[in-house]
């Protein structure tokens, strides 16, 4: 069994890793690299919104005051967990789907044949690149619908977290348009 010192050190190490991962993502996001970009940022913000909804749900479940709504909140927790995972996955998926489009922009267009080829490739790549943002939009919308129940029936101590979660999901939705 770990003693208090070992637990604190373990927590501190996890916190440092998390800060490093966030810093790395933000550094890459702010670089001149085309990915990650707005799509990946939208996916991440949506996942953060879901996480806030999950926090509200977890603060609600198991409390006497909310016993009557516990089953409904548990269902929301299950759905938000799935939506959060999909939004996290969308961060990398968006970058992968955008790479061919970024490469297509570099294709030559000196001759008519090159112009036609570039146009064809660009159209195909644009379609593929738009799929993940559309998915982010859908996942964010599905998540937002669950927040009305959290707002009405979730722990009143976490009502501000419901509001921040809603704003995150709205940003994810509009950012993916």
Language model: regions and residue ranges:
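Amphipathic alpha-helical interface segments
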Residues: 94, 98-171
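Amphipathic, well-ordered alpha-helical segments in soluble domains
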Residues: 21, 25, 48-55, 97, ...
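N-terminal amphipathic/hydrophobic targeting modules at extreme N-termini
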Residues: 3-5, 9-11
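Transmembrane signal-anchor/signal-peptide helices with a preference for the extracytoplasmic
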Residues: 55-67
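A structural-propensity feature for long, helix-poor, extended segments
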Residues: 64-103
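Short, hydrophobic/aliphatic alpha-helical segments
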Residues: 17-36
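Conserved phosphate/anionic-ligand binding catalytic regions in large, soluble enzymes, centered on
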Residues: 31-54, 158-176
């Amino acid at each position: 069994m770990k003693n208090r010192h070992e637990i604190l050190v373990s927590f501190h190490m996890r916190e440092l890793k998390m800060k490093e991962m966030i810093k790395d993502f933000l550094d890459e996001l702010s670089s001149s690299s085309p990915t990650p970009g707005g799509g990946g940022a939208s996916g991440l913000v949506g996942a953060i919104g879901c996480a806030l909804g999950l926090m509200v749900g977890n603060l609600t479940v198991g409390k006497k005051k909310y016993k009557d709504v516990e089953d409904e909140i548990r269902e929301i927790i299950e759905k938000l967990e799935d939506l959060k995972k999909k939004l996290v996955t969308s961060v990398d998926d968006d970058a992968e789907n955008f790479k061919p489009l970024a490469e297509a922009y570099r294709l030559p267009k000196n001759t008519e044949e090159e112009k036609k080829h570039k146009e064809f490739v660009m159209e195909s790549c644009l379609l593929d690149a738009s799929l993940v943002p559309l998915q982010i939009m859908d996942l964010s919308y599905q998540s937002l619908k669950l927040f009305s129940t959290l707002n009405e029936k979730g722990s009143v101590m976490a009502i501000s977290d419901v509001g921040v979660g809603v704003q995150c999901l709205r940003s994810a939705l509009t950012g993916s348009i």
